């Protein structure tokens, strides 16, 4: 089965070569669909070298817009029966595609792999905040997921309204449509953590804003959620301050930018 790896990237000149080097050696059949969301550095120049070196294997398109919009465009250009996603700041284990394909061929429609953080040790060890729906963890990041094309066609791909958390929203709609997310720990992606304090807290802030967007669209998601679970886990200085900044993002989006397409829907449901 052909696997299309769809990459939505912007300003990844320091990382994109490592990612592409790790993808061109994967077990085929495979294609790599790179969608540049209007980089202002040398990202496109670097990707173009791979397009020339690996014709038919690596393809590049330019599509500015939200992550969801650019990624949906990449999906529309992809030819594979399996659509896999990862990020421009990641590196794929040599057997990543083989493991994802194996899980799909075993009858699974959505597969999440194991993501290993690389960078400052304290940031590497920060846990994901799980979000469960129908007993399934929705918080698997799209930097290591694969979907059968039919799933994306049925649920409509990514919601372009989201700033962040578009992957959690896609996971929710996939589970809500009756598909199961299967975890394959042998499908490994190495993900670089943010390199500066500013980027670390900026990511936390926008992740918080994304959680507010999820609330506007899927208020019921949080009905059985226990915030104290986060405090019962290993709480470090970094996890606590990340949480505080995320709450600021959540409140900020609520106060200043909560007039999106789902605001009226939520009000009617109350």
Region annotations inferred by a language model:
Residues 21-30:
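Short, acidic, metal-binding catalytic loop of nucleotide-sugar glycosyltransferases
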Residues 36-45, 90:
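A conserved acidic beta->alpha catalytic loop
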Residues 62-78, 139:
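Glycine-rich, basic loop-to-helix element that forms the pyrophosphate-binding segment
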Residues 83:
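Short aromatic/hydrophobic "clamp" motif used to bind/position activated sugar donors
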Residues 94-123:
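Conserved donor NDP-sugar-binding/catalytic core segment of glycosyltransferases
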Residues 117-118, 130-147, 163, 169:
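A recurrent flexible, glycine/aromatic-enriched loop bordering the glycosyltransferase active site
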Residues 144-145, 151-156, 161-188:
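A short, conserved alpha-helix in the catalytic core of glycosyltransferases
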Residues 198, 202-270:
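Non-catalytic, C-terminal membrane-associated alpha-helical segments of glycosyltransferases
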């Amino acid at each position: 089965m052909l696997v299309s790896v769809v990459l939505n990237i912007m300003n990844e000149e320091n990382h994109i070569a490592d990612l592409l080097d790790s993808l061109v050696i994967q077990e085929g059949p495979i294609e790599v669909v790179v969608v540049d969301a209007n980089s202002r550095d040398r990202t496109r120049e670097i990707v173009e070298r791979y397009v020339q070196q690996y014709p038919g294997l690596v393809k590049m398109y330019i599509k500015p817009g939200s992550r969801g919009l650019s990624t949906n465009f990449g999906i529309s250009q992809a030819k594979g029966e399996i659509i896999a996603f990862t990020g421009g700041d990641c590196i794929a284990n040599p057997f990543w595609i083989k493991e994802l394909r194996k899980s799909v061929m075993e009858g699974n429609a959505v597969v999440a792999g194991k993501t290993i953080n690389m960078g400052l040790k304290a940031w590497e060890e920060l846990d994901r905040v799980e979000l469960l729906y129908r007993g399934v963890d929705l918080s698997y990041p799209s930097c290591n997921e694969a979907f059968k094309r039919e799933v994306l066609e049925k649920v409509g791909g990514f919601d372009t309204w989201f700033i962040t958390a578009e992957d959690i929203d896609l996971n929710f709609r996939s589970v809500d449509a009756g598909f199961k997310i299967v975890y394959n720990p042998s499908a490994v992606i190495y993900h670089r953590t943010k390199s500066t304090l500013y980027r670390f807290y900026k990511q936390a802030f926008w992740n918080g804003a994304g959680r507010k967007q999820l609330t506007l669209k899927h208020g019921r998601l949080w009905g059985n959620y226990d915030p104290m679970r986060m405090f019962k886990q290993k709480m470090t200085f970094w996890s606590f301050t990340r949480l505080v900044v995320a709450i600021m993002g959540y409140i900020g989006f609520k106060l200043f930018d909560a007039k999106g397409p789902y605001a009226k829907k939520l009000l009617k449901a109350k």
